[in-house]
Every structure is written in structure tokens, then in C-alpha cells.
């Protein structure tokens, strides 16, 4: 017998399917989102099936390369370089991180629809080798758990680790995201992926993603702006709107594993997470660790982020934490956060 959630969700899936087949061509043409325009100059130095390696470096030295790992989730890596004054990339460069790279995940296609978490690990490993280990990893949101697991899987390839708004122990505190996932049955997830031809389509995931109903307030909160009065503020608003409209499609197996392994089963925090043939023990991550959480973050609440401190093998004196007075998106694109927290991270990375 269907539970109440299934009874609600099956009609939703069916309606979505009918709507897509009836209106998809015209809708896609009319609503095609603006392509990503980077705020900071960069060049692509490696093009893999699942990601691009972008080099933002201002010099030739590779003494302390920093690799920012964007989330492979609903939206693209534009959140790391949204607009002047709203860019972790810009802040890191301006404060001494001159050898700076970004893992920019591609939207999944028919060719990559079977990718798994292992596939993402393998791609990230190739990127680190391309840069030249050891690297400093800066994991943003979903890129955070991947970075922590990578540092535990390949400890000799990492020097320092920064996690920003990263869900590490997903049972440490309730979140809007876990609240969305918990009622969804495995059958519904499989059906969503089947209807996407093996992909979890971003436009479908967006319908389930928790977000405030007041879009204007959400935008201003994410950017940490008052009502815009300057051209720079208006540009930031426009860039946010374009970023918000660009959705990434996810490989079905990868999406399924993230939902089950990270959220429902909390495998990373409980030592039951496997990557590339080995069980991941967070205690193998003995490098200095910086944790940044948002005080009002309902996607990765502070307790989920700061739980990493008790899981890793780093010395207590090598762990630094910071709590920013903001929500989730403002950690990556907020003006105040870019002015205060990211320079602090850059200084810490130079240690």
C-alpha cells in the first residue's frame, strides 16, 4: 500500500512527465538560461568527461596550490565566482592564494549517466595529480564531504582542508534538505531517474529543493545586500538570477548514492563510506582543518559542519572553526562573508 507521501508524489511525477512531453521544446527555447560568465579570468587546463579544471592563478609558482571543489548538486560552480565582491575565488586571490584552481563539474549527459561517487573521486584524483600534490582543498557544500573523504582516502595528496557549509554528519542536526529527502522512498527516486533517461534532471530536482517562497528576500539574503542602489549590486542580482536558473543534471547512480549513503545512512560520519575500493576512515585525515558554517544555514546546519572536528585525526590545535552570521548561500556569495570570512581562510591557508 502506498504511504501518504507516495500518494502525493506519484501524481506530481506524472504531471511533470506530461508537462515535459507537451511543452518541453518551446519551454526550453524560451527559458534557456544565460551561460555562465566568470567574474575572474581563468583558463581551462584539463577537460574530463565529468569536470573542467579551471586555473585562476595569478603566478607560476606551485608551492601551495589551492583547489576549490564546487558542489556537484543542483547548481553549477558559478557560486564560487558570482560577481565582484561576491566571490570566494576573488577573495582568495586578493589575499594571497595566488595558485588557485577550481573543480567545475559538468552537467551529466547520456555518456556520463552511469557515473557514481567513485567516478567523481577518480576525476578529482586526476585533477589533483594534474595540479601536483599536495594541494590545499576547499570544499563548498556538497564538495565538502567529497573533499573530506578524498583527504582521508589520499592523505599524502592533501596539505590543508577547508570545509564551508559542508554536510558531514547529517544526523547531527535536522536540515531542510534532509527533511525533504527522508519521506522520499527508493522507488520514487528510481522513478524520477527513469523518467530522466538515467539522469536526475535539475529542473525536476528544483521542484523538490527547499527554498523560501519570497524569491526577492532569498536573493538579497544570499548576496547580503540591501535593496540595490548601485550598478555593482544590480549586476550581482542579475548574476544570481542567471545562476539560480542554471540547473545541473546528475547521473542517476551518483544521485542515488548521495541520498542513501550520505543522508539516509550517514556513512561518512559512521565509518561505513567506501571510495575506490577502500573504506574511508575520517581519522586518516590528520591535516590542519578549517570549518566555516552559517549561523542560519538550514541546508548544512552548523552542527553538521562542526561535527567534522570530532571525526578527523587532526590535532585539536590544528582545527579552526568560524560561524558566519548568515544562511547557506551567503557563505559562498554573500558580500559580508566575502569581506570577512574568506580573507581569514586565505590567511589560514598561508600558514
How does the language model describe each region?
Residues 1-17, 132-133, 146-253:
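Alpha/beta-hydrolase-fold enzymes
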Residues 1-52, 85, 107, 136, ...:
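Amphipathic, low-complexity, repeat-rich surface-exposed segments
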Residues 31-32, 38-109:
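Short, surface-exposed "cap/lid" segments of acyl-processing enzymes
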Residues 138-147:
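Gly/Ala-rich beta-loop-alpha elbow adjacent to hydrolase catalytic centers
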Residues 285, 291-293, 297:
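Short beta-strand/loop motif that positions the catalytic acidic residue
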Residues 298-304:
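Conserved alpha/beta-hydrolase "acid-adjacent" motif
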Residues 309-329:
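Catalytic histidine neighborhood in serine/cysteine hydrolases
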Residues 325-340:
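Catalytic histidine-centered segment of alpha/beta-hydrolase-like enzymes
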Amino acid at each position: 500500500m502506498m504511504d501518504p507521501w507516495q500518494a502525493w508524489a506519484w501524481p506530481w511525477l506524472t504531471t511533470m512527465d506530461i508537462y515535459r512531453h507537451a511543452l518541453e521544446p518551446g519551454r526550453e527555447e524560451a527559458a534557456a538560461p544565460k551561460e555562465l560568465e566568470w567574474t575572474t579570468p581563468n583558463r581551462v587546463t584539463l577537460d574530463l568527461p565529468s569536470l573542467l579544471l579551471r586555473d585562476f592563478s595569478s603566478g607560476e609558482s606551485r608551492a601551495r596550490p589551492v583547489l576549490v571543489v564546487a558542489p556537484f548538486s543542483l547548481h553549477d560552480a558559478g557560486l564560487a565566482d558570482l560577481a565582484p565582491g561576491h566571490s570566494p575565488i576573488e577573495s582568495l586571490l586578493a589575499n594571497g592564494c595566488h595558485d588557485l584552481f577550481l573543480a567545475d563539474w559538468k552537467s551529466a549527459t547520456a555518456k556520463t549517466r552511469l557515473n557514481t561517487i567513485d567516478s567523481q573521486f577518480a576525476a578529482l584524483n586526476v585533477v589533483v595529480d594534474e595540479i601536483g600534490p599536495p594541494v590545499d582543498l576547499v570544499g563548498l557544500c556538497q564538495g565538502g564531504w567529497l573533499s573530506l573523504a578524498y583527504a582521508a582516502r589520499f592523505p599524502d595528496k592533501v596539505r590543508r582542508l577547508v570545509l564551508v557549509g559542508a554536510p558531514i554528519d547529517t544526523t547531527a542536526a535536522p536540515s531542510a534538505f534532509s527533511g525533504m529527502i527522508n519521506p522520499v522512498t527508493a522507488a520514487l527516486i528510481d522513478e524520477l531517474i527513469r523518467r530522466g533517461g538515467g539522469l536526475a534532471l535539475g529542473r525536476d530536482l528544483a521542484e523538490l529543493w527547499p527554498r523560501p517562497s519570497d524569491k526577492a528576500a532569498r536573493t538579497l539574503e544570499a548576496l547580503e545586500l540591501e535593496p540595490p542602489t548601485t550598478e555593482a549590486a544590480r549586476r550581482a542580482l542579475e548574476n544570481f538570477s542567471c545562476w539560480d536558473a542554471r540547473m545541473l543534471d546528475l547521473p542517476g547512480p551518483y544521485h542515488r548514492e548521495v541520498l542513501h549513503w550520505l543522508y539516509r545512512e550517514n556513512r561518512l560520519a559512521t565509518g561505513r563510506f567506501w571510495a575506490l575500493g577502500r573504506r574511508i576512515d575520517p581519522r586518516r585525515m590528520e591535516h590542519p582543518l578549517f570549518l566555516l558554517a552559517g549561523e542560519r544555514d538550514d541546508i548544512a546546519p552548523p552542527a553538521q559542519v562542526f561535527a567534522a572536528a570530532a571525526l578527523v585525526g587532526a590535532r585539536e590545535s590544528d582545527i579552526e572553526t568560524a560561524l558566519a552570521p548568515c544562511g547557506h548561500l551567503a557563505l559562498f556569495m554573500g558580500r559580508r562573508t566575502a569581506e570577512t570570512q574568506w580573507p581569514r581562510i586565505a590567511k589560514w591557508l598561508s600558514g
